[in-house]
Design a protein with these regions (language model features):
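P-loop/Walker-type NTP enzyme "switch/lid" segment
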Residues: 4-14, 21-92, 120, 166-177
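Structural beta-sheet core signal
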Residues: 36, 81, 103, 131-133
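Conserved nucleotide-binding/hydrolysis micro-motifs of P-loop NTPases
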Residues: 41-43, 109, 136-140, 163-164
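Inter-motif core of Ras-like GTPase G domains
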Residues: 86-108
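Conserved C-terminal guanine-recognition region of P-loop GTPase G domains, centered on the G4
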Residues: 112-134
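Beta-strand-loop-alpha "switch" segments that mediate conformational coupling across diverse proteins
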Residues: 137, 147-174
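NTP-binding/hydrolysis catalytic cores, primarily Walker-type P-loop NTPases
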Residues: 175-199
Length: 199
């Protein structure tokens, strides 16, 4: 049975889709059969998949979402869902159908506040959730301070604020393809391993 992992965050600019595609590439390279489902009206995941080519990606919405996720689960062993930004019925249903919710957030108060409805939904649906700090600045105490404010399971693994992630996304690629031995590639691999260990 496929594992369904949803990426959810209400605040735009948190890097939800960027984190998803980095992990998708990592798991594809590791031999997983990965299917992507894009529920975000912005369609960034679908655009990335279109640039890349050869990726199993379904753009879906409202009434089709559940059936599209189930169909993807029949084709793959790992389904990654890019959730819509608003906390509505569709997001709740997707969280209910998921094995794990990944909630990327920048280490800022606005991002952390925006996590609260997603965290509460996951609790109500009894779906495991992990917060991932993303776009963490190289200097300062922002990440450390954020860790003290999050009332949810927060992974130790985090993603730094690195230009290569945006550069790769614009080309339909992953950071590890542009800079295979970079800190960015190491961070994605470490995050993937941490998520793999959650069952």
């Amino acid at each position: 049975m496929a594992r369904i992992m949803s990426f959810a965050q209400q605040k735009g600019g948190a890097g939800k889709t960027t984190v998803l595609v980095q992990l998708a590439h990592h798991w594809m390279q590791a031999g997983h059969k990965v299917a992507l489902v894009d529920l975000d009206p912005q369609g960034s995941l679908s655009r990335w998949a279109g640039l890349r080519g050869g990726v199993d990606c379904t753009a879906s919405s409202d009434w089709k979402a559940s059936s599209d996720i189930r169909a993807a689960a029949r084709r793959a062993d790992l389904v990654l869902v890019d959730c819509p930004g608003n906390a509505d019925i569709l997001l709740r249903a997707t969280i209910r159908d998921s094995d794990l919710v990944v909630a990327p957030a920048q280490p800022s108060m606005m991002d952390l506040w925006a996590l609260e409805p997603v965290v509460e939904m996951a609790r109500k649906e009894k779906t495991p959730l992990r917060v991932v700090l993303n776009r963490v600045p190289p200097q300062g105490r922002a990440a450390e301070e954020a860790r003290g404010m999050i009332e949810a399971d927060l992974l130790n693994e985090q993603i730094g604020n690195r230009v290569v992630f945006q550069q790769a996304f614009a080309l339909g690629k992953a950071a590890a393809e542009l800079q295979p031995r970079s800190k960015a590639a190491e961070e994605v691999a470490a995050l993937a391993a941490a998520l793999d260990a959650i069952r």
